[in-house]
């Protein structure tokens, strides 16, 4: 995707692939992840998070998985139907309770903020 120029991106991070940078950020994202509608790069980043949940590599204290919230039902069910795949992967795994699809950013915020800490 488009990466706006900045000092970090041009001077330091250019030595790392986007996937490595994103994986490092997701590994530290213990309160949850909110994914807004996007295209190829956004889908790839969302599934990096889904993969961490699938293998339970994001469990915090007490083994609680942080939420991953996709915002925009129409987008994630119709435009780029990633939601059915996320639900299929979740199945009866523990991650099923950690993945959510909502319509608004406000709903996403409520989900993330209501998570037990």
What is each residue range found by the language model?
Residues 5-6, 18, 25-28, 56-64, ...:
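Solvent-exposed alpha-helices and their adjacent loops that cap or buttress functional pockets
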Residues 1-35:
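Acidic/glycine-enriched connector segments
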Residues 41-50:
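Short glycine/serine/threonine-rich phosphate/pyrophosphate-binding segments
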Residues 61-117:
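C-terminal functional extensions of proteins
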Residues 36, 53-56:
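Glycine/proline-rich loop-helix segments at beta-alpha junctions forming the active-site rim
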Residues 1-2, 42, 75-78:
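Short gly/pro/ser/thr-enriched loop/turn and capping motifs at secondary-structure boundaries
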Residues 35-37, 71:
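Thr-Gly-centered strand-to-loop micro-motif
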């Amino acid at each position: 995707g488009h990466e706006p120029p900045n000092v970090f991106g041009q001077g330091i991070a250019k030595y790392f692939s986007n996937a490595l940078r994103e994986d490092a950020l997701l590994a530290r994202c213990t309160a949850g992840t909110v994914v807004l509608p996007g295209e190829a790069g956004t889908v790839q980043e969302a599934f990096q998070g889904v993969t961490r949940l699938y293998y339970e590599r994001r469990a915090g204290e007490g083994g609680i998985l942080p939420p991953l919230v996709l915002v925009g039902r129409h987008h994630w069910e119709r435009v780029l139907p990633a939601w059915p795949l996320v639900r299929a992967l979740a199945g009866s795994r523990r991650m099923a309770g950690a993945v959510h699809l909502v319509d608004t950013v406000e709903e996403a915020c409520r989900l993330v903020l209501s998570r037990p800490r």
